[in-house]
């Protein structure tokens, strides 16, 4: 059975960077949960999700061949299907101002003027930034649900 390290936290906290670094250091494959949540065959990115069953099936199929793996991201609606596969869980946190800046810079780097005022992704980008600002309260994902998930896990836990 595959066993892995799961890195959670708000967008812009550095999950992907840490996940890739740890995977590289350990020689494990890295899986970004976003790749299993959002359909890529859409005109506007990050607008259409796979169904819960598709998320679980696609990710399960990809990690199956590996004894160990590193995974990062938010899987609030389907983590139950993977909880027994984690040997370690890392909660990574960054202050809201730092996160918002990182998320905005990343979006501009990926999508250019599309996320700036007048662009076709501007409104969805603003909603995403607002949701990230609300991580400590009622965003999706949010601090309380991720802490609860981590507290209910029986694996090793680290907070950074």
Model-derived regions: residue spans:
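NTP-dependent small-molecule kinase module
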Residues: 2, 25, 130-160
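Hydrophobic anchor at the beta1->P-loop junction of P-loop NTPases
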Residues: 7
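The conserved Walker
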Residues: 11
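Walker A/P-loop
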Residues: 16
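Conserved substrate/cofactor phosphate-moiety recognition/catalytic segment
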Residues: 20, 24-64
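Conserved beta-strand scaffold positions in the cores of enzyme catalytic domains, especially
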Residues: 30, 89, 155-159
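Glycine-rich phosphate-binding loop used to anchor ATP phosphates in small-molecule kinases
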Residues: 52-97
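A glycine- and Lys/Arg-enriched "phosphate-lid" helix/loop adjacent to the NTP-binding pocket
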Residues: 93-141
């Amino acid at each position: 059975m595959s066993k892995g390290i799961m890195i959670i936290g708000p967008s812009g906290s550095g999950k992907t960077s840490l996940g890739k670094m740890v995977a590289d250091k350990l020689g494990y494959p890295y899986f970004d949960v976003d790749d299993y949540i959002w359909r890529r065959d859409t005109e506007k990115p990050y607008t259409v999700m796979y169904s819960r069953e598709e998320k679980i099936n696609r990710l399960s199929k990809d990690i199956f061949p590996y004894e160990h793996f590193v995974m990062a991201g938010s899987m609030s609606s389907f983590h139950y299907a993977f909880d027994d596969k984690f040997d370690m869980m890392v909660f990574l946190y960054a202050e809201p101002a730092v996160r918002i800046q990182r998320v905005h810079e990343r979006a501009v780097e990926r999508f250019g003027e599309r996320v700036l005022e007048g662009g076709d992704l501007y409104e969805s980008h603003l909603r995403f930034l607002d949701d990230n600002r609300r991580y400590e309260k009622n965003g999706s994902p949010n601090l309380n649900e991720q802490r609860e998930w981590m507290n209910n896990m029986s694996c090793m836990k680290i907070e950074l």
